[in-house]
């Protein structure tokens, strides 16, 4: 990494690198600490050594942990994470603040809310559910479906990130979300309708490390970045389903 920074000039670092996902962090916490905490500190240290003074960091709504204030505001407490993943991403935010105070590295931490869309990670609910429903296999629904998620389409996430890249702000934490949480069972019903198949629902208790609700207050994103999510869940899911049927199902016929 040092060689990269000494041979190239960077105006802004876009920091997406991470070990992602709540559930795997229960099984392999050391991987999350090494990647998300030590990796971020290493990056910040190389930045300050090479006079790179701006970063936009992909953080997560999981940082809010057990907060009961909804919608989630950036001023809400974020000191009770319920997963190692959340703790490591929050730690990275705090490291960025320290480097801002010590070295003047400006960082905008964007807390993403339940990102979905084409080319999603294999462990994300929409893709896992689509694959299982198509194959006639059961889907695991935690807390018996009594969960709410602020699903945010990938194109909206990208738009918010690009706006942050072009907007120096010192040090800020900003929610990037849709602002309209949906019950998990409603999400499943919509996916069933768009796939044209019913799901075999396996209703389970709350999963370790999970939270009941995510719900973004997007006021700050509007004020500082001029950002508002444009894609509702039905429209975004339809784009996902079209992609899934074209890409995944076509692979099965080869």
Regions found by a protein language model. Give the residues of each.
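N-terminal Rossmann-like NAD(P)+-binding domain of SDR-like oxidoreductases, especially those catalyzing
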Residues: 1-115, 155, 231, 243-250
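Small-residue (primarily alanine) positions within well-ordered alpha-helices
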Residues: 17-18, 58, 92, 160, ...
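Glycine/proline-rich active-site loop of Rossmann-fold NAD(P)-dependent oxidoreductases
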Residues: 90, 105-108, 115-128, 135-138, ...
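Hydrophobic "lid"/C-terminal helical patch
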Residues: 133, 161-165, 188-191, 237-244
